[in-house]
Amino acid sequence: MRYLTAGESHGPRLTAIIEGIPAGLPLTAEDINEDLRRRQGGYGRGGRMKIESDQVVFTSGVRHGKTTGAPITMDVINKDHQKWLDIMSAEDIEDRLKSKRKITHPRPGHADLVGGIKYRFDDLRNSLERSSARETTMRVAVGAVAKRLLAELDMEIANHVVVFGGKEIDVPENLTVAEIKQRAAQSEVSIVNQEREQEIKDYIDQIKRDGDTIGGVVETVVGGVPVGXGSYVQWDRKLDARLAQAVVSINAFKGVEFGLGFEAGYRKGSQVMDEILWSKEDGYTRRTNNLGGFEGGMTNGQPIVVRGVMKPIPTLYKPLMSVDIETHEPYKATVERSDPTALPAAGMVMEAVVATVLAQEILEKFSSDNLEELKEAVAKHRDYTKNY
């Protein structure tokens, strides 16, 4: 399974093409749109979310509510594009129109300046448009397809925010994936501890009044993953490594950890390793899950627990100093639309990219042309694992 995304933030549409989804997977536009709505939600989101109401259109690969095995093409129309017809025109336009929204003041923390140097742009809008987090719309759409596939294989995934700008959220122990999903869905800030809800919302309001932004940490948990996805035989086949790449590829994500993560560096080995248990009913299990569901780069049957850290959104309403690329004079950075935080939405994107990588691994390990064969192969493997 592989995919590509295309489109600009203020262009006419966003597009994704997925190849390798088996035939026979039940799939509707609403399956995708539900996750797109979740991506646009969350406390603290701003003006763009009021303009766009993303809805996907299938243009290939799905017929009568099921995948056909052919490449799946999905489009999302950018409604805001009507205000940008000249600025984002594919055809050449008059110089006076080109300069109308030209960007020469790069924003610190964005791709603006480096992209301009790399691709030799005199208008940094070219960098801004493609590097925008608007691109994650299609990664969420691809992830929604992946999640439908995982659900057919009895795998469940959820995400929630565990740190808001330095404020850690207490997470009750032993919550199931379903419980995490339910609690986070009921929260405007995607946390599982409702007692902290108003405190976090008040904090976001204060950050907005200050013209500033905050980052934080989001966690994705996946249950029901078969044993042995990934491999230790080559570095690039380790599944946790592939997940790490996917997570830090998300806009503004700067780090990733599994299970205890960096805390493991402060503990003794006897306090980190997960003891192995066996029972006739459950087969092999672990006493703890400090390693986040991975051993040797492979899934061990425990829930996958992965966290990603997101830096504060770099677009500030009290902009930092920058330099004009034409005059080299100091200026305040360009201000585009921004939010005080996008952590709940970022969690949705992280859930999507994790689901996508897991779907890719499942299809690699249990190669099948249609859903029925895939389900049979996974069920057979689970029986083998239990009786090993």
Swiss-Prot record:
UniProt organism field: Streptococcus pneumoniae serotype 19F (strain G54)
One GO BP annotation of this record: chorismate biosynthetic process
Molecular function as annotated in GO: chorismate synthase activity; FMN binding
Quaternary structure and interacting proteins, as annotated: Homotetramer.
PANTHER family to which the protein is assigned, alphabetical: CHORISMATE SYNTHASE
Pathway: Metabolic intermediate biosynthesis; chorismate biosynthesis; chorismate from D-erythrose 4-phosphate and phosphoenolpyruvate: step 7/7
Coiled-coil stretches noted in the UniProt entry, renumbered to this chain: none
Binding site for FMN: 130-132, 251-252, 296, 311-315, 337
GO CC term (a single one): cytosol
Name used for this protein in its record: Chorismate synthase
Catalytic activity, EC: 4.2.3.5
